Amino acid sequence: MELSCSEAPLYGQMMIYAKFDKNVYLPEDAEFYFTYDGSHQRHVMIAERIEDNVLQSSVPGHGLQETVTVSVCLCSEGYSPVTMGSGSVTYVDNMACRLARLLVTQANRLTACSHQTLLTPFALTAGALPALDEELVLALTHLELPLEWTVLGSSSLEVSSHRESLLHLAMRWGLAKLSQFFLCLPGGVQALALPNEEGATPLDLALREGHSKLVEDVTNFQGRWSPSFSRVQLSEEASLHYIHSSETLTLTLNHTAEHLLEADIKLFRKYFWDRAFLVKAFEPEARPEERTAMPSSGAETEEEIKNSVSSRSAAEKEDIKRVKSLVVQHNEHEDQHSLDLDRSFDILKKSKPPSTLLAAGRLSDMLNGGDEVYANCMVIDQVGDLDISYINIEGITATTSPESRGCTLWPQSSKHTLPTETSPSVYPLSENVEGTAHTEAQQSFMSPSSSCASNLNLSFGWHGFEKEQSHLKKRSSSLDALDADSEGEGHSEPSHICYTPGSQSSSRTGIPSGDELDSFETNTEPDFNISRAESLPLSSNLQSKESLLSGVRSRSYSCSSPKISLGKTRLVRELTVCSSSEEQRAYSLSEPPRENRIQEEEWDKYIIPAKSESEKYKVSRTFSFLMNRMTSPRNKSKTKSKDAKDKEKLNRHQFAPGTFSGVLQCLVCDKTLLGKESLQCSNCNANVHKGCKDAAPACTKKFQEKYNKNKPQTILGNSSFRDIPQPGLSLHPSSSVPVGLPTGRRETVGQVHPLSRSVPGTTLESFRRSATSLESESDHNSCRSRSHSDELLQSMGSSPSTESFIMEDVVDSSLWSDLSSDAQEFEAESWSLVVDPSFCNRQEKDVIKRQDVIFELMQTEMHHIQTLFIMSEIFRKGMKEELQLDHSTVDKIFPCLDELLEIHRHFFYSMKERRQESCAGSDRNFVIDRIGDILVQQFSEENASKMKKIYGEFCCHHKEAVNLFKELQQNKKFQNFIKLRNSNLLARRRGIPECILLVTQRITKYPVLVERILQYTKERTEEHKDLRKALCLIKDMIATVDLKVNEYEKNQKWLEILNKIENKTYTKLKNGHVFRKQALMSEERTLLYDGLVYWKTATGRFKDILALLLTDVLLFLQEKDQKYIFAAVDQKPSVISLQKLIAREVANEERGMFLISASSAGPEMYEIHTNSKEERNNWMRRIQQAVESCPEEKGGRTSESDEDKRKAEARVAKIQQCQEILTNQDQQICAYLEEKLHIYAELGELSGFEDVHLEPHLLIKPDPGEPPQAASLLAAALKEAESLQVAVKASQMGAVSQSCEDSCGDSVLADTLSSHDVPGSPTASLVTGGREGRGCSDVDPGIQGVVTDLAVSDAGEKVECRNFPGSSQSEIIQAIQNLTRLLYSLQAALTIQDSHIEIHRLVLQQQEGLSLGHSILRGGPLQDQKSRDADRQHEELANVHQLQHQLQQEQRRWLRRCEQQQRAQATRESWLQERERECQSQEELLLRSRGELDLQLQEYQHSLERLREGQRLVEREQARMRAQQSLLGHWKHGRQRSLPAVLLPGGPEVMELNRSESLCHENSFFINEALVQMSFNTFNKLNPSVIHQDATYPTTQSHSDLVRTSEHQVDLKVDPSQPSNVSHKLWTAAGSGHQILPFHESSKDSCKNDLDTSHTESPTPHDSNSHRPQLQAFITEAKLNLPTRTMTRQDGETGDGAKENIVYL
């Protein structure tokens, strides 16, 4: 394929032509598309054929300046797009694009002179701009202008009263199209009246420049100019571009790597054929009357439409706007659905049972018009209400208006109109204004699915429209496949509705007829995805989501059996075809889910069919009911044992344990099947329980076989067949369909499957012939066709075919039906079992065996075709359509599959045809006499070459296909797909690896079968000769395939080894050349043999070596770090040329061999050992063969060329010798000059100038590589001379005595300049030019540094000289020394340069003389040889330049990578610094926290020490208290009896007597019991807690222990203000555990301890109770031993009588 252009501007819009070779055939009925694939965008455009092999298209605009791949794709009906050829086009940024961008960016900064300054960068004049007028408009149109941009600049800027605009600029230039373009942009009208800085408007400027025609055009321009470019954004990644001038449509998609080319082309075709959408989307805004409505009536004129549009109300217009916005949303969702075809499934699964109110009105209307009735039911509360909102969701259009049927697909509605009598009015009468508005808007916004279904693929009853319609059907035959889901799973084609003129009768009334309701309903039939239900574009006037879904979902029922037992509902593949009669109307049928069936009683209330129909349906329903009752679980158990044997005979099922992917039901009991308890019939695919198999109905296998033999092969689902008008028949499932079908297969019953893309042409022709016959029959007798359809429906409903049960959508029905019929013919084991026994007995034994082998050959060939069919239709098609895998990936798994199918199918049909010819009076009995000629024809000439090529490629990629399959199996989705396909009975439990293996093994079966046939064939016959020839051909084919596989495996192994070889490894050859990995990558080198050998070193060790025998060399490699490197053993080269290579055995080693290389560079010998003697011999044999077949060295030299080579080498040696001599002389000159400098330095020191810095070295070093640069030295010398002159003048002004020295200095300077032959003006000019132009860029860095130092020192000296006129002689001497050093260095540099120049001149002279001598002395073949050598040198030079260029590019890339790494390193360094600062701040915070914690820890330790000290004090105090208590206890026991107590009657006092007093008195001891009680009471009142804490005695205990003289206690009133020493002494004597201190005194004991209960712990109960027994014993003893007397006394103070009980001791 050749393209007419290789470059295009960024905005495109130029014609491109693709020319194909003459041998390339372009089908006439195919569509061609141009695709432009860039790095980020893909463009799809349609192409037009202008010649037989030339296609024309337009180049679209592109976003990047890059090279795109242009491909031409062919699309034909039923096939995937095929790439015909490809090329490349480079998008360039031309002058118009650059100028357009400049105008957009400079819109805010225009001045009165901008029309001249803007053209300066482009070197344009005002006269050349008119040629760029249109290109500028296209470039500006292609640019994406900012949102706030206007012609006046940014809208945010204030518009001044005088400013220049882009319109002024365009009018100055006189560009008419650009001016009109700016006028249509925002701000264009304001710019027309805006004066510029000079006060001139754009029109004034145009008149001033002489563009009067432009002024006239702009004056007459009223904004009607339509833009040349329109765009509709379909989604985030897809958009449509329409060029109005060329009328070209482009689909642009971003991120091309995520989309398949086939899906993108389908998306483009979808919108390209949806002309109604294109007209509404891309129609210019200047024509609103054409965009508002699309009238389908030819009677209405354009003015009527305008009037009707203008007469609409505001509410109607607002509704139309809402509908338009709804359609835009719909298109976005629909495009996203087309881009992602993976996520769709049926929403009808969840639909609710519709109301039956609609059925009465609809069915009563429908039953009056036809014999066969199919009803589509949906929820409508009132039949006469037209208030149904327009809904357009995911390609579904719901309408109540019949105008949708007449909607056309053409942009110009006036060109294609319908007849008046068949077209309804555009705006029907309705009382509901909103419904009318929706209907009107809906008329112009038909969805693609509904419009295409009603206009393209149906046979209309309008004869006047057939001519124009046929053209459209031809070009959009596959549109249905686009509207439906293209995945091929779970979806079907949209329903097609036929309309007749009679169906339009009720279109002008307010109440819709059944046809209108049917149009509403059927338009909701096409693909509806629940995955989009969350993002439905619902407007404000739509109903809720629940009512919407229930309204859109359609369900259909057959009047013959409303109770259809079907599983999961899909969109039904069906065809409804119109008959020629106006009264016949067919309605589409869809299958309802089982759980949503309408009950029979409710349905029958509203259906009143004719008598015959009613009786027929009644019988059908009764039969269905009885069958369900008979197969119920209750009756099944009763009849199980009785009818087991009869059922066994009748059923003839072949049950086997089944595997199911989903939830299935039993055919008998309708219960869920479990894996272990389920059985599946291999014939009819019926699923039952193990216990229900006896009650299963009869197998339908035999009925289907009989039907398959008699039925016509008409497949109605093919796209090519849809173009043909069909008779008035409709397909619907019957009620007797078995319930136990799998969910994925139930919907296939009664449906028609579409053809696959691989249907051969003969099958299509047979389909067309059958369709034509059906059409002719329908034209002559419609009743006959209907009766035929009844028989067809009954046969398909009552006895569905085996293939219908087990076949899924991915399988082509026609091909599988042919294969199944062939399988039935060859299902027997041998030929003797196929023919009649009597016929077989009449044949000879050899004939029978020969026929058995021939039958086996045909049978295995048929099985092989089935295997290929499984691979193609079950696995490959599903991968492409369901998994959406890339076609290249699928082709890697199934290489050459279509070619294999074609070859083997042709071979099988040839043998089958020979079988038909060999029938002996009966179809069953046959004897094949000749089979050899078919075998010879199959395996010879063209067929043999095809089979060798195809099988060679298939077998070569066998391992790759299996490995790729295993890699894909890691994906969960792919695993589920394979499991589902393997469970299919068609796959016969064969996976993809098994199928691939069977295909590779097929060709190895032919020799065995042919040899057996040959064994039983008579010799010296033609058949025997053919069989022998065929056997040889088969073996030759197998050998060729085997050779191809071996070569391919060797190449793959060689590539693997090359990939493992280290890139930097190399080895040196004997001739000194370096052999690298790149030298191995030659296409001429192929791998002949390889293996592991052992290289014996000089020390006797063995090295493991990988030996590779190539076509011209023998290579030794070593493995290192999982990489291969050239072997390095004994410093011998590891690459041996096969030229003059000899292999010899080692004398005493049967596993060793010597490899002797007798090359001209030098002989070399290698000792190689192998694992065995056989391997050694094999290596020697293969090396000998390789040496014999080794190609000769390229460019073999003759003796004369060798002599020339020696002469050339001699000349080169001589030149090198001269160069060495010159170099030595230069070095000597440099040494002499340095010696002179050293002498000058010594003289300076001897003269007494010690402060002068003298450097005795030159500023250059003699380098033989590159000559030194002298320009910088010369410049420095001139500067030094100037500084010396300044110093001498300064010294002359300072002292007269120095004049002699000054003159001497000048003479020295002059002598120095003259002695060294400093060049005059040419050198000065050279230095000046060098300084001005290049600076010191070419100067050696060391020289430049030294010269810079000298210049700085000289500058300081000059300043010093100027400041101090009396400069010393040392400064002058320093300047002279520097100047001398520079001049000597300059002299050395010039000498070295002269040497280099002489060497180069000598080399050039030698080359010129050599070429001249060759041209004079030699000619003929030698001259040709020299020219070839020169060409080769030129090529090598070009290669060197190319390598240099690549090196430079690599350096630039490396520099960029370094910069990126530096930036990344800087970023990371800043981040690390920031992180370090954060860490430091956190560390400081932690240190502060640690200090605070340390302080807290110290405080805590101090507190803990204080607590411990207090605890120790408390313990010591407790010990002291316990000691005191013990002392008191001892003291109490010792002193208790000698301490009597007397209670005086005058008050509550207890007197303690001294020991002497107690002895002097009557030894009496008195205890006042009342006093003790009083003390306890007082103590309890003051502080009762102490008593409980101290565990004192209760009063009751004291009462019981003391002896009472009176039963009544006497209450004593004690004054609390007086101290009670008595109680104190008393309780002190009783013990410390029983003390109660007076609470009015200080609460401290004798040791000043606080006794407050809140601070001091009380003694433990044990301590207090320990002394109680002692006190009791003491009192008891006193009671018993001492006499008692009672004493009564009156209390004088209180006057109250009180009794006291006193005990006298």
UniProtKB/Swiss-Prot annotation:
Any one annotated GO CC term: cytosol
Keywords: Cell membrane, Coiled coil, Cytoplasm, Differentiation, Guanine-nucleotide releasing factor, Membrane, Metal-binding, Phosphoprotein, RNA-binding, Zinc, Zinc-finger
Stretches the record annotates as RNA-binding: 1496-1527
Segments forming domain PH: 1086-1188
Chief site of localization: cytoplasm
Task performed by this protein: Functions as a RHOA-specific guanine nucleotide exchange factor regulating signaling pathways downstream of integrins and growth factor receptors. Functions in axonal branching, synapse formation and dendritic morphogenesis. Also functions in focal adhesion formation, cell motility and B-lymphocytes activation. May regulate NEFL expression and aggregation and play a role in apoptosis.
Name the record gives this protein: Rho guanine nucleotide exchange factor 28
Source organism per UniProt: Homo sapiens (Human)
Gene name of the record: ARHGEF28
